Amino acid sequence: SAGHIIGSAQIYLEYKGEVVIISGDYKRRKDATCAPFEVKKCHTFITEATFGLPIFTHPEDKQEAKKIIKSMENNKEYCHLIGVYALGKCQRLITILRELGFNDIIYLHGALMKISEYYKERKINLGIIKNISELRTNEYAGKLILCPPSSLSDRWSQKFRNVIKGFVSGWMSIKQRVKQKNIELPIVISDHADWNE
């Protein structure tokens, strides 16, 4: 396993006693949604380098997820609209929030539902998740709603009033990206290895 997302894998090649491993996307951090990264002895390791610079030292995942919970506690009249990638990041964020004791219903954009149901079928505990279409506009206050990042700035998101927009990505450690995307609640959680990993 590469520990990146569910089903991720490394490529292991052996020829005449020489072993080469090609990591593909990977991370070394604990993740309840996928098998952990497998360390294998090799002569050559070909790594991804999405965050392969010293400036990318990601904070602890649970500390970042706590920012969402704290913001919700401090801003009960607002809905929290959080951008997450549909495969992996959505489900990982949900499991981290559940581990932190957040047991409220988490509402999902329709584009996130099918993949999340797949994770649930694989016995990954996401708690209660529902499609956002089950809520009326006047019921958004105080709710946590996850959506694809592109939805944060398209017509779909215009129906939300009193909203705090967040985005969960390793790229949220770059202040210019946060500003460009008009994100109020940047959450630095990545499915890729950082510099120290």
Listing of model-derived features with the role each one plays in the protein:
Residues 1-34, 75, 130-161, 165, ...:
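Core dinuclear metal-dependent hydrolase active-site scaffold
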Residues 1-88, 99-100:
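His/Asp/Glu-rich metal-coordinating catalytic cores
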Residues 21, 43-46, 107, 146, ...:
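Hydrophobic/aromatic beta-strand patches that form the interior of the parallel beta-sheet core
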Residues 32-34, 56-59, 92-96, 118-119, ...:
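A short secondary-structure junction signal
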Residues 37-39, 96-101, 123-124, 159-163, ...:
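Short, solvent-exposed amphipathic alpha-helical segments in soluble enzyme
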Residues 65-78, 84-142, 146-147:
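Hard-cation-handling environments
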Residues 109-121, 171-173, 178-188, 194:
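Short, flexible loop segments at boundaries between secondary-structure elements
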